[in-house]
């Protein structure tokens, strides 16, 4: 999927954003995405964006911005990572994902939203990308395809028959890397040997995209009950403090890179 970089606002890495609301972050997201259909990459690696996010996180930590909605929307995902929703507006959402060592996705899947942009803030995220294949290809494997559909406040799973997938590429997305994928990109996060944290923006879900695809080796007869474990206030504060440190480190990386470019210019 092609990406387009937007340099506006990235020229002044020393600029410190003073506005502490998620609205300031949201406006920066819209500036990069251009349109609400998620046509362009959100430059999460841009110093101005990172500083807006850090200012907002600091306001959450010092109590000047409310955390009620964040606490309500965030939980520990069954695949072994903390999913912290920092804010949502006009179809866009910004999240912090913290992966525990040794935990990974239980299935191959795609997404409902039109696009995902992700900046690795800590560790290296091993990701296995797959593609549809013909049964007679030597590296093809048979998988059971399911549609995972949202129905009101609940989800239902429908078996759609077998299909064949083959490995496309296995990538370790490293610290400081910004990567993107569209709704149809099949992937699976593999277990990491170290803690991993990513800052993620999901783009609006198309009106007709009420499902995503899940692929497993067995047929899922019915969804197992999912008990979403909510973060305690103490866990949330610890993760936000950790995020603030990671954002500061990312700003320092940007400054180092800018200095290096200046030296070699």
Each language-model region and where it sits:
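A short, N-terminal "cap"/entry segment at the start of jelly-roll beta-barrel domains
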Residues: 2-93
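Catalytic micro-motifs at enzyme active sites that drive phosphoryl/nucleotidyl and oxygen chemistry
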Residues: 71-73, 104-110, 188
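Conserved short histidine dyad/triad with adjacent acidic residue
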Residues: 95-110, 129, 133, 183
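Short, conserved beta-strand element in jelly-roll/cupin
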Residues: 112-127, 131, 201
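A short hydrophobic beta-strand segment most commonly corresponding to one strand
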Residues: 117, 194-210
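Short beta-strand His + acidic residue motifs that chelate non-heme Fe in jelly-roll/DSBH
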Residues: 127-128, 181, 186-192
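Short acidic-glycine-tyrosine-enriched beta hairpin
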Residues: 131-184
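Long, compositionally biased interface segments
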Residues: 208-264
């Amino acid at each position: 999927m092609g990406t387009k970089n937007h340099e506006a606002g990235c020229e002044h890495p020393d600029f410190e954003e003073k506005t502490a609301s998620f609205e300031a972050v949201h406006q920066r997201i819209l500036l990069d995405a251009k349109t609400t259909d998620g046509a362009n990459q959100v430059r999460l690696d841009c110093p101005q964006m990172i500083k807006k996010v850090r200012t907002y996180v600091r306001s959450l930590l010092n109590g000047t911005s409310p955390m009620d909605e964040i606490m309500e929307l965030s939980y520990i995902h069954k695949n072994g990572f903390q999913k912290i929703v920092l804010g949502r507006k006009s179809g866009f959402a910004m999240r912090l994902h913290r992966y525990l060592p040794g935990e990974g996705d239980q299935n191959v899947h795609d997404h409902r939203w039109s696009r995902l942009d992700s900046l690795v803030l800590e560790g290296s995220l091993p990701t296995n990308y797959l593609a549809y294949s013909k049964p007679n290809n030597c590296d093809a494997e048979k998988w059971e395809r399911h549609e995972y559909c949202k129905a009101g406040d609940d989800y239902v799973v429908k078996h759609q028959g077998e299909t064949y997938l083959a490995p496309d590429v296995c990538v370790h997305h490293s610290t400081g890397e910004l990567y993107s994928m569209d709704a149809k990109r099949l992937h699976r996060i593999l277990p990491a040997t170290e803690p991993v944290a990513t800052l993620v923006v999901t783009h609006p879900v198309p009106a007709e995209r009420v499902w995503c695809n899940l692929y497993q080796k067995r047929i899922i007869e019915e969804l197992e009950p999912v008990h979403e474990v909510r973060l305690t206030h103490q866990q949330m504060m610890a993760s936000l403090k950790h995020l603030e440190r990671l954002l500061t480190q990312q700003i320092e990386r940007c400054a180092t890179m800018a200095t290096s470019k200046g030296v070699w210019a």
